[in-house]
A protein has these predicted regions:
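Walker B catalytic motif
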Residues: 31
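Acceptor/aglycone-binding surface of glycosyltransferases and processive sugar-polymer synthases
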Residues: 4-20, 25, 37-118, 143-163
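Hydrophobic helical membrane-anchoring modules
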Residues: 42, 86-88, 112-194
Length: 194
């Protein structure tokens, strides 16, 4: 258990965790998330096959989003599709907070997001692609707040931070020649009891 001296929020918690990470890979994951734990083995396989970043996806074949706000889900799906079209983003779900990153690669990036909930994960995906990292995706069924209290998502302040990184990513993708990056996808393993 770590003490976070940087203050509240996902970005500060993430920075503290990265500073104290000792392993080769860093798993970024919300402690109150359910379901995607099953994807960790597939994420590890992709990392071991050479990926620098593996992101879970709700929007590729085999992925789904259950629960949560319909408006939030629709905004997320539309924003990801628009961002992919505008920038050539290889990930189908750049905004998800469930990522595994090679620590040595992560240390080469400066994460700047300060507020905005999981916008730091979006920033990470953008900067990883611009740097030409090898990326992978694992489809998940994300179960969002079906129980356990209300989400802390606030469209106003969080939306501004996501918009900031959306616009920054579009501008950078037009300014900086894109380094080749490809996405490898693995379907999560299923239990076969036949």
């Amino acid at each position: 258990l770590l003490h976070n001296p940087d203050g509240r929020g996902v970005a500060n918690a993430l920075r503290t965790g990265i500073r104290h990470a000792a392993g080769e890979y860093v798993l970024i994951f919300a402690v109150d998330d359910t379901g995607p734990v099953l994807a960790i083995d597939e994420m590890l396989r992709l990392m071991e096959s050479g990926c620098d970043l593996v992101s879970c996806t709700r929007y590729a074949r085999g992925g789904r989003r259950l629960g949560g706000s319909r408006i939030g889900g629709l905004l997320s799906r539309i924003a990801n599709a628009m961002f992919r079209r505008a920038t050539g983003m290889k990930l189908t779900d750049a905004t998800t907070g469930i990522k595994m990153v090679r620590r040595s690669a992560l240390e080469s990036l400066r994460l700047e997001a300060t507020t905005g909930g999981w916008a730091v994960a979006f920033e990470l995906a953008i900067k990883a692609q611009l740097a030409g990292w090898r990326m992978g995706e694992v489809p998940i069924i994300s179960i969002d707040r079906l129980f356990g209290g209300a989400s802390t998502f606030a469209l106003g302040p969080w939306g501004k931070e996501y918009l900031r990184w959306f616009l920054w990513g579009v501008a950078q993708s037009r300014r900086i020649p894109r380094l080749p990056s490809a996405v490898m996808t693995r379907q999560p393993a299923t239990s076969d009891k036949s």
